[in-house]
Amino acid sequence: MDSTSETRSGSWLSVIALALAAFIFNTTEFVPVGLLSDIGHSFEMPTSQVGLMLTIYAWVVSLASLPMMLLTRNIERRKLLVGVFLLFIASHVLSGLAWSFQVLMLSRIGIAFAHAVFWAITASLAVRVAPPGQQAKALGLLATGTTLAMVLGIPLGRVVGEALGWRTTFMAIAGLSVLTLLYLARSLPLLPSQNSGSLRSLPMLFRRPALVCLYVLTVVVISAQFTAYSYIEPFAKQVAQMSGEATTLLLLLFGGAGIFGSILFSRYSEAFPRGFLLAAILALGSSLALLLPLSAQPTWLMALSLLWGMSIMCFGLAQQSRVLRLASDATDVAMALFSGLYNVGIGAGALLGSVVSERMGLASIGNVGAALALAGLLLALFAALRYAEALKSTSL
C-alpha cells in the first residue's frame, strides 16, 4: 500500500473529519422536519404539502446514488469529497435565498445529488482510514456524527429558524460546511478509488439472497420510521399540544438517544447479531404504536422519544454493518444501493405520512408506522432463520 495514500496505522483524525461531514449532511437532510410549520407559513402551504420536500429529496437521492457512484468511481476520494461539498454549499446558499417553494425544492435537489455521492462512499472510507482492528469503532464514530446531527443539528436548526427565520438556518449550514470542507481537505489522506465496483457488480450482488433481504428490510423499516418522524413537529404541536420549546426538547431527546444506540451497537451487535436487530425493530414498532396513547402526557412522550431514538440508530448501524460485510468486494456499489434504498424508505414514509395526515389525521401517523414496523419484524425473523449462516456475524 502506498504510504502517500493510506497509512498502515490509519488515522482517527481522518475518521473524525468524516464524522464531522456526516454531522453536516444529516443535519441538512432532516432539518426541515423541525421547520415544516415555518416554511409552510412563508409560502402559505399546509405542512402536509411542505413535508413532501422530504419525499422529493429522498427519492432524488435514491435515484442518483448508484448512477453518481458509477460516474465517479475512478475519482480519487478526497478530491471527490471536495467537489461534493462545493455543490452542497452552493445549494444551501440558494436555499437561503429561495423566493418561492419551487426554488427551494430546486436547491434541495442540488443538495440531494451531493448527498447521494457522500453516503455512497463515506462508510467504506471510514473503514479504510481507521486504525487496524478499529473498523467497527470507526463506523460507530461516523454514527456519532449522524447522532449529533439529531442531538444538536436539528434542534439547533429549529431554534435558529424560530429566532431568525428558517432561511438563516440554511445559510448557517452553508457557513459550517465551508469550515468542514477546509478540515476535510487538510486531514484526509489521498484515497484512490478502491473496491468501488461497477455495473458488473450488480448481478453479483443481487445473486446474494441475504443481501437482497437486508435491502428489502431497510425499505420497510425506514418507511415505518418516516411515516411518523417526518411529521413529528406538527404532531407534537397539534396533537400533543406541546409548546415550541417542548417540541424542540422532544427532538433533542430523540437525537440524544441515538448516542446510546451507537454505544449499544458497539458493545452488543457482534455478540448478539440476530437478537440485536430483532430487538431494535421491536423497540421501534413499540415506540410508534405508543406515540398516540402517550401524546396526552408530554413527559411520557419525551421518555418514549428516548426508546425511539435508540432503536432507529441501532437498526441503521446493524444494517450498514451487515451490508459492508456481505459485499466486501464491491463496497461502494453495495453502499450506494443501501443509501438509495434507505432514501426510498424515507421518501415512501414521508409520502405515506402526508397521505395519512390528510386522510386520517396527524394522530394516526404512529399507528400506520407501527403496522409497517410489524411487517419489518416478520421479515427480519424470516431472514434470521433462512439466512442464519450468512447473517451470523456483523464483524467487518
UniProtKB/Swiss-Prot annotation:
CDD domains documented for this protein: MFS_NepI_like
Matching Gene3D superfamilies: MFS general substrate transporter like domains
Residue stretches spanning the membrane: 15-35, 50-70, 81-101, 103-123, 136-156, 170-190, 209-229, 246-266, 276-296, 298-318, 333-353, 365-385
InterPro entries, per database record: MFS (IPR011701), MFS_dom (IPR020846), MFS_Efflux_Transporters (IPR050189), MFS_trans_sf (IPR036259), Sugar_effux_transptr_put (IPR023495)
SUPFAM superfamilies according to UniProt: MFS general substrate transporter
Family: Belongs to the major facilitator superfamily. SotB (TC 2.A.1.2) family.
Function: Involved in the efflux of sugars. The physiological role may be the reduction of the intracellular concentration of toxic sugars or sugar metabolites.
Name of the protein in its database record: Probable sugar efflux transporter
UniProt organism field: Pseudomonas aeruginosa (strain ATCC 15692 / DSM 22644 / CIP 104116 / JCM 14847 / LMG 12228 / 1C / PRS 101 / PAO1)
Gene: sotB
